[in-house]
Amino acid sequence: MDRIRIVGGTPLKGTITIGGAKNAALALMPACLLTEETLALSNLPHLVDITTMANLLAQHGVTMALNGDAANGGHTGRVLELTAAHIGNTTAPYDLVRKMRASVLVLGPLLARFGEARVSLPGGCAIGTRPVDLHLKALEQMGAKIELDGGYIIASVQGRLKGAHVIFPQITVGGTENILMAATLAEGETVIANAAREPEITDLAECLVAMGAKIEGIGTGTLKVQGVERLHGAEYSVVPDRIETGTYAVAAAITRGDIELVGARFDLMESVNKVLTECGVHVEETPRGMRVRADQGEITGVDIMTEPYPGFPTDMQAQLMALMSTAKGASMITETIFENRFMHVPEMTRMGARINVHGSSAIVRGAPKLSGAQVMATDLRASVSLVLAALAAEGETIVNRVYHLDRGYERVEEKLAACGAKIERLKDGVAE
């Protein structure tokens, strides 16, 4: 099992290229099921979760072709063509779905186009309870018959789904994506109230419009979808990853470095940039993306509360906790989105971080210096927060179970090493 070795204490300086957003790509890929024509996606990140989704779609009968030349050593220049002309299987099996919760996003498209779907209940990072009940209740409102049997969601509908007024009792990103896709082929108008407003949902909606969907209110909390009889193919480029952007912004800050993030969308970074600015980091837009500098002055603790977009993202909480562990003074970090999302805390305390958890809040008191240690990744964002802490720590840190990291970050050690980080991947105890 791979591990990562880091010797901390070097300020990072240079440029890092930001890839396409994992969470956008994982919703865009199943959208291919809504048409028999080809959906061509560019700027796809090369990640384990993307491969898992590709394997799931292939199991349904989607044919795929990867064209174009790779740019920047990654898959930035590649175009993935997905064609769902001959779908022979509407079952999403447990062995694939258990690896990643986003697999449930095939449910809406399969049901809308084929009138049936059998999808295993989802897996992914073990962070609290992520109920798919909200997806299922909304599909029932649209006329679907839903049963749970042997760990599978069995959904069917006579004829087409019917437009409905769906009001989500709480904001759900996956639920909004599933119902948005299903509604494009439903009969009549669907209104999705209390819809999630994440940029990845805007990206999905704009791709669906490019495929012939009729959607109003994109980017707002109320989406109106006028169903059409069929969608067609399209070419679409995945939005840059705001979480990857934020993570490398914190890498610059925590090492007191200076990094330009090429390809970053500055307009999607408002909540993260506000927090970074408040704690003393200099953030500015550049013609190529954004620049983050923390090589002058000190970092001070600030309070953070995670919220649905446009609030501070839950997927940046662990990274900011690492930064606050090195800041002057105290900060309070409150997690309102997911339960059980402080699994990185015991590992950070092994490195000398001073963190006390009280329910859904963590009090972080900045430590004079973190020190290297053997630590273990428990989930995707926790794993990268340990890498960030290690970059700032004195001495050597070994991060174990980095397969979590590969689910969400493309070539992380390569990108950091290019900015001066002393970092290497170890395979079975030896350097690659």
Swiss-Prot record:
GO CC annotation terms, alphabetical: cytoplasm
Similarity remark: Belongs to the EPSP synthase family. MurA subfamily.
Domain of life (superkingdom): Bacteria
Keyword Zinc-finger: no
SUPFAM superfamilies given in the database record: EPT/RTPC-like
Stored InterPro entries: Enolpyruvate_Tfrase_dom, Enolpyruvate_Tfrase_sf, MurA_subfamily, RNA3'P_cycl/enolpyr_Trfase_a/b, UDP_GlcNAc_COvinyl_MurA
Principal location listed in the UniProt entry: cytoplasm
Residues annotated as binding phosphoenolpyruvate: 22-23
Protein name in UniProt: UDP-N-acetylglucosamine 1-carboxyvinyltransferase
Modified residues annotated as 2-(S-cysteinyl)pyruvic acid O-phosphothioketal in this record: 125
Residues where UDP-N-acetyl-alpha-D-glucosamine binds: 101, 130-134, 315, 337
Catalytic residues, chain numbering: 125
Localization terms from the record: Cytoplasm
HAMAP family named in the record: MurA
